[in-house]
Amino acid sequence: MKGQILLCIYMIILFSCSVNRDDKGINVETNKNIETLAICFEIADKGFWKIPFNDYQPMKYLARKRFEQFRDQNVIQIIDTLVNKGFWLDAMVEVLLKSSPLPNAELKYELEKSTISRLSNNKEEATRLINEFLISLNKFYIDARLPDYFTENKNYFDSVNNEVRKNLPNKHFIRTMESYYGKQNDSYTLIPVPTLWHTAGLGLRIKGTSGFKVYNIFGPLIVTKDSLDFGYGYNNPDKINELTVHEFGHSFINPVTELPENRTLIDKYNYLFKPIKDKMAKQGYNNWWTCVTEHLVRLGEIRISYALGDSSRADRIRNDYINNRSFIYLTHLEKVIIDYEKNRKEFKSINAYIPILLKSFGQIDTLNYKN
């Protein structure tokens, strides 16, 4: 215990002294492109139109009631066609995030190859379909008078953003996280979308100048049938914390675990997936690569909590992840990561140390991990 306390003090001193720049904040903003897409999904047959909902979600209800009359718009038919091809909401959100603002939306940033391939193996064909989608959405934005809608509901969207802001983590969090990983990103942005299904969300990143522009798009975090309990749907500090500490952590870990040489290393130890395969699948983690990446992100959460001086949170989430979520290899990984924390002159960033973490899986005796 004494050693752990000393290490915690060491980490706090290290990170407070090693960074001279101002604290980088977390942006919270409404994205009208994505909000408009969410409205279209509410009235599309292959979206959510045929799915009833009983929980209190005022903007979801308003979208269906106000825009039902536009269900025959071309964009709704195109959305149904794209969904049939496997190009669902998450892919369309990427398109809208990487496009200029409606009603003049056109693609500004390159889409992920995996996203394009969901439409067609022919890049020209995929590009044509995406352009048709954007042109039709531009028309919908004008015909359905979305500018008026956003003006009329400005106070609601502002209140949503303020509710998120008041639940943001420690103001030193971004600085500490970047120091721990030894890397920087251009920006970090949360995009609450009150028209989306509650608990829906996804993380995206756009290549920037010194790193990535990191985004997290998410629906309401409150699940209730009572308007008094709902507020604006985002007064949930635990969920906001998860969206920042956990999801932003992926922007540092995923680009490294996605490297071909590291994928090969990960696959070498895929026999370790067997003891926890069923419990991981219940959480949506269906393969060993995803399981390892999630282990590393959660490892970072624990260690960064120590760096922020919050050992109680570190202990709490460690217990939750190991005993309730079956991330059973965290105990081993924590022992290994100490070497990284003590030798930052040698390991300038987590990129250099992840191969060591991955190779350390070979030290694990599966007989000790019958979960």
Task: For each feature predicted by the language model, list its residue ranges.
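Bacterial Sec-dependent N-terminal signal peptides
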Residues: 1-24
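N-terminal mature-domain "stem" immediately C-terminal to a signal peptide or N-terminal signal-anchor/transmembrane
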Residues: 20-109, 325-338, 342-350
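Active-site scaffold of zinc-dependent metalloenzymes
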Residues: 117-120, 203-238
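Auxiliary, metal-adjacent structural segments of Zn-dependent hydrolase domains
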Residues: 157-218
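Active-site recognition of the HExxH zinc-binding catalytic motif
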Residues: 238-258
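Post-HEXXH active-site segment of zinc metalloproteases
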Residues: 254-281
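Pan-zinc metallopeptidase signature
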Residues: 299-371
